[in-house]
């Protein structure tokens, strides 16, 4: 049963897939390579990514791929369907008058028919045909809230959303403003909302939100963080090289600026997610964020690596594509960024395959996260709760430490993370020079002042 897999202890593996329209073909190039390497690693030529990843999440085009993988399709099968879908979905534009008056370029019916054919009557709550954890990100337009729709039965809103057909949720995730009309969904409680592309938010790259979904107590998964406990693989759709000159910007019209805004936003959202994920993780694929931050290799938040993290993506620049042996004109490079041009699919597929061959390495996937690795139990203990364990009484050995009362609130960065202390608490220095904080009352109950070894006054007061 799926629910047993979601509740099972042990290391967990997450897959996060960006939005990006037709550029999802690039994503599939990376996924084919990952699936091939993992199949070799597990000795199974028929290996599926649904067998490896315990939770797969996606936004917009990423939600189509995520759902296909979650029902057990191989990446190559999804790519074949993508090529069939692309021309139908983005083939026939609405007239310019329709675009001006109604605000969308494409008829959503071809997308609906294609997704219905793809996923049939599978609902979000189908615990048999959906083989792994699945999360689809969309945005509710009238409340401005980003929704994570997932299939864990213990979720707060699972009973209200479980009957929604996958094809309909995916349409909601992919209903990009100016491209398609919003999708209206009504849940089992009778609440009806208008939903648009999840990419119109910070979750166009959903990696950080997927990490929170896996670990926060507000959500039902409750997976334990740690670089040996969680692996998150994040895959992009490729990005345009947006660098330009002052002269070009001086000539940009109002419509030109308006057309560029989605790309600006998606770029910033992706950079922010990338920065947060590298700050939280151990990552062999860490990229330079900017010239000042570098790749954040030495900057770990609270001195704790909350997960292992892999990020695969490519910039459509002459430099990066040239390194792969792909030479394109400036006009063609600029055209690759379009999210709705099916004529780009062949070259995008080639870029994805070659980029993956170069970037995705077998040793990125540690044996710690091998599917057949013997499961080790990971327990999270929390202060304030009681546990039926055979506790025994112990007395601390007489190991001298140094301590100093601090008259104001303070923080201490320790190997375990950041400690918070209040005014009057003690800053303690241990025998190895390590610092930690000790509550004033606990300090008085635990320690007594002694002469400093070798004379010179007391070492604790």
Give residue ranges: language-model regions.
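Conserved small-residue
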Residues: 20, 62, 115, 136, ...
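Small-residue-rich anion-binding loops in enzyme active sites
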Residues: 1-18, 27, 144
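Extended hydrophobic secondary-structure segments that form protein cores and membrane-embedded regions
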Residues: 14-17, 51-60, 133-139, 194-196, ...
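Hydrophobic, mid-to-C-terminal alpha-helical segments
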Residues: 204, 208-253
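Active-site gating loop/helix substructures
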Residues: 91, 129-216
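Patatin-like phospholipase
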Residues: 11-14, 22-118, 156-159, 168
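A motif-centric signal for short, conserved binding hotspots located
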Residues: 381-432, 441, 449-454, 461
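C-terminal helical/tail subdomains of lipid-metabolizing enzymes
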Residues: 202, 223-225, 237, 262, ...
């Amino acid at each position: 049963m799926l629910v047993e897999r979601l509740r099972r202890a042990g290391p967990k593996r997450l897959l996060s897939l960006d939005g990006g329209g037709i550029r999802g073909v690039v994503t599939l190039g990376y996924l084919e390579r990952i699936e091939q390497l993992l199949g070799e690693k597990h000795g199974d030529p028929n290996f599926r990514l649904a067998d490896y990843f315990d939770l797969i999440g996606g936004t917009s085009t990423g939600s189509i791929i995520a759902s296909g993988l979650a029902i057990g399709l191989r990446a190559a099968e999804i790519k074949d369907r993508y090529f069939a879908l692309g021309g139908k979905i983005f083939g026939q534009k609405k007239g310019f008058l329709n675009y001006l008056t109604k605000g969308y370029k494409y008829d959503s019916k071809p997308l609906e028919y294609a997704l219905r054919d793809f996923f049939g009557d599978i609902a979000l709550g189908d615990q048999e045909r959906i083989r792994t954890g699945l999360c689809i990100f969309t945005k509710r337009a009238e409340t401005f809230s980003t929704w994570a729709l997932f299939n864990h039965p213990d979720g707060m809103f699972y009973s209200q959303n479980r009957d929604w057909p996958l094809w309909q949720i995916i349409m909601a995730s992919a209903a990009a403003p100016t491209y398609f009309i919003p999708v209206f969904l009504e849940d089992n409680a009778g609440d009806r909302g208008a939903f648009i592309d999840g990419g119109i938010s910070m979750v166009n790259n959903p990696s950080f939100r997927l990490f929170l979904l896996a670990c926060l107590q507000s959500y039902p998964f409750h997976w334990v963080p740690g670089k040996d406990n969680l692996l998150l693989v994040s895959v992009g759709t490729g990005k345009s090289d947006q660098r330009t000159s002052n002269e070009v910007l001086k000539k940009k019209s109002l419509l030109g600026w308006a057309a560029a805004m989605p790309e600006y936003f998606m770029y910033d959202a992706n950079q922010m997610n990338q920065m947060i994920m590298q700050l939280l993780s151990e990552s062999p694929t860490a990229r330079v964020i900017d010239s000042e931050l570098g790749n954040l290799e030495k900057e770990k938040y609270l001195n704790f690596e909350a997960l292992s993290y892999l990020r695969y993506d490519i910039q459509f620049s002459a430099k990066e594509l040239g390194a792969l042996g792909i030479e394109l004109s400036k006009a063609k490079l600029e055209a690759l960024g379009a999210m709705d041009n099916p004529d780009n699919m062949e070259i995008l597929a080639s870029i994805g395959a070659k980029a993956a061959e170069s970037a995705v390495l077998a040793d990125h996937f540690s044996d710690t996260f091998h599917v057949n690795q013997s499961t080790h139990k990971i327990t999270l203990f929390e202060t304030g709760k009681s546990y039926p364990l055979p506790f025994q009484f112990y007395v601390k050995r007489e190991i001298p430490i140094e301590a100093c009362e601090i008259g104001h609130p303070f923080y201490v960065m320790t190997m375990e993370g950041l400690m918070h202390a209040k005014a009057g608490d003690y800053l303690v220095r241990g025998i190895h020079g390590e610092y930690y904080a000790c509550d004033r009352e606990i300090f008085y109950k635990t320690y007594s002042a002694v002469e400093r070894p070798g004379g010179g006054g007391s070492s604790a007061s």
